[in-house]
């Protein structure tokens, strides 16, 4: 019981983060604008929804209006114009959200910088990555083929935006900033405009994605922390194999009920979860929980998660959002891969004196394949090829210089190879490279008003070899994390995928 209390004890550091004055500083909006511009260079294609109307004149006008407190009284009858935002509500609201998202990330960035500065002294650092849409428990690199069942979970969303604000108040103790956040959410957005998807899953609206990903992930971060607690307390190999799923979140009053339940009969409560082969992955609005256990165990997990999340996290959840699938009979599109477990037959001949025996063995093998058809569909949607995979030119890039055209195609090709480097079969990737190479050649030929054959004869095929063979240092999508606890320090094999923007080439569903 003392171990549980130590785990749930909040960290008293980083309690005073006075961020509200920063919302009136011009450089904050400039830094937020430049930060988004630099990060957009890492995605596969240019972001068509990026707002390039930033100027210091607009920032000065916005800050002046925010200083005038009377203008915070906004008439809700006029949805397009009001005294505070003036005539361009969409532009101002986007600037405020970008600036606020940059500000609320400052405490976590400072914690990361402080930890990195002391890393040379062999201090294990911890940091938050609350804009990522991924979080992983040891999964793909582990011996996944020995697992039996998978829970496919559609992560629910909070029933009210106020819950997002309450989640942040455990980390940011600046009441003024939280009041501004609450005012901003309730005046300019509602839950329907925040979540814009007609499918069973959901996605965020294209505007202000950085802001809402931060809020939503801080909320999901809290829900996922229950896996940390249960996994650490129940695993037979808890001290060496798995470590913690996430850094713990201190949900105070909500967790007190959980402590009371465990205090009554701790061992009886946790017997359902004693499974050393439990894996968790979150990808956008989905997550999976894989286990070596039986169907009965997974069914108990299912109903436990539904009841726990509904009671303690105010989630709009029902059992229809969780499906139990047998791993050997189902393949799934997850994290951009087509993953499946197949039986790999092998035959062993045994010779014993004059008798020989043939022994058939079926070995499970975990395959991660590149989904060719959806990926070609994404390329076709971006006008690199037809729906049948025939390369075509990219007319909108014809006005660029030759080097810029080659650089754009090369960056897309390298990023695709980098993202799908974990595939067990690379044949599909070489076909994608062929499509991009020929599309690049046809774009260059269109620019110079010639055929592809004539263009290659005049310029030489070496022109395109560079973007096919050159190695560029690409920012790694995964990086190791380290966690610490109040009763010791340990290194855990946890990876977070630093992906906060998904375009059509990766998000084909």
Swiss-Prot record:
Look up keyword Cytoplasm and say if it applies: no
The domain of life is: Eukaryota
Q: Name one GO cellular component term.
A: chloroplast
| GO BP annotation list | mRNA processing; RNA splicing; tRNA processing
InterPro entries, A to Z: Domain_X (IPR024937), Maturase_MatK (IPR002866), Maturase_MatK_N (IPR024942)
Keywords noted in UniProt:
Chloroplast, mRNA processing, Plastid, RNA-binding, tRNA processing
**Subcellular compartments:** Plastid, Chloroplast
Q: Which GO terms describe its molecular function?
A: RNA binding
| Functional summary from the UniProt entry | Usually encoded in the trnK tRNA gene intron. Probably assists in splicing its own and other chloroplast group II introns.
Query: Which family is it part of?
Result: Belongs to the intron maturase 2 family. MatK subfamily.
Q: What is this protein called?
A: Maturase K
Annotated source species: Nicotiana glauca
């Amino acid at each position: 019981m003392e171990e549980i209390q130590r785990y749930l004890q909040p960290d008293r550091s980083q309690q005073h983060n006075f961020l509200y004055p920063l919302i009136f500083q011009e450089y904050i909006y400039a830094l937020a604008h430049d930060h988004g511009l630099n990060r957009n260079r890492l995605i596969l294609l240019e972001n068509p929804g990026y707002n390039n109307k930033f100027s210091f004149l607009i920032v000065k006008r916005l800050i002046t209006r925010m200083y005038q407190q009377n203008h915070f009284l906004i008439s809700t009858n006029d949805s397009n114009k009001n005294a505070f935002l003036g005539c361009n509500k969409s532009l101002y609201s986007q600037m405020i959200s970008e600036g606020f998202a940059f500000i609320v990330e400052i405490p976590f960035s400072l914690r990361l910088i402080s930890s990195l500065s002391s890393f040379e002294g062999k201090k294990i650092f911890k940091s938050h990555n609350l804009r990522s849409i991924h979080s992983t428990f040891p999964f793909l690199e582990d011996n996944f083929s020995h697992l039996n069942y998978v829970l496919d979970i559609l992560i629910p969303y909070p029933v009210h935006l106020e819950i997002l604000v309450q989640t942040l108040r455990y980390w940011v103790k600046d009441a003024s900033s939280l009041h501004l956040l609450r005012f901003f959410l309730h005046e300019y957005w509602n839950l329907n405009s925040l979540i814009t998807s007609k499918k069973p899953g959901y996605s965020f609206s294209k505007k202000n994605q950085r802001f809402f990903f931060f809020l939503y992930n801080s909320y999901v971060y809290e829900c996922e922390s229950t896996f940390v607690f249960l996994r650490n307390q129940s695993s037979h190999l808890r001290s060496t194999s798995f470590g913690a799923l996430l850094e713990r979140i201190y949900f105070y009053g909500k967790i007190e009920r959980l402590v009371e339940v465990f205090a009554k009969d701790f061992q009886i409560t946790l017997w359902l979860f004693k499974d050393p082969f439990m894996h968790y992955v979150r990808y956008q609005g989905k997550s999976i929980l894989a286990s070596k256990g039986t169907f009965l165990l997974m069914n108990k997990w299912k109903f436990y998660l539904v009841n726990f999340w509904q009671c303690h996290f105010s989630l709009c959840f029902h059992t229809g959002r969780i499906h139990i699938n047998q791993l050997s009979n189902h393949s799934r599109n997850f994290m951009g891969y087509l993953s499946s477990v197949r039986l790999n037959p092998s035959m062993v001949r045994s010779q014993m004196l004059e008798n020989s025996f043939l022994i058939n063995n079926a070995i499970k093998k975990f395959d991660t394949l590149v989904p060719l058809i959806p990926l070609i569909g994404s390329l076709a949607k971006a006008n690199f090829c037809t729906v049948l995979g025939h390369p075509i030119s990219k007319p909108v890039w014809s006005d660029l210089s030759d080097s810029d055209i080659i650089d754009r195609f090369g960056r897309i090709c390298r990023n695709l190879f980098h993202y799908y480097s974990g595939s067990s079969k690379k044949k599909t990737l070489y076909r994608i490279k062929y499509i991009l190479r020929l599309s690049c050649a046809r774009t260059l030929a269109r620019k110079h008003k010639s055929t592809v054959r004539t263009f290659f004869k005049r310029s030489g095929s070496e022109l395109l070899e560079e973007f096919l063979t050159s190695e560029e240092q690409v920012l790694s999508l995964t990086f190791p994390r380290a966690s610490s606890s109040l009763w010791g320090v340990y290194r855990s094999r946890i990876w977070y995928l630093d992906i906060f923007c998904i375009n059509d080439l990766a998000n084909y569903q």
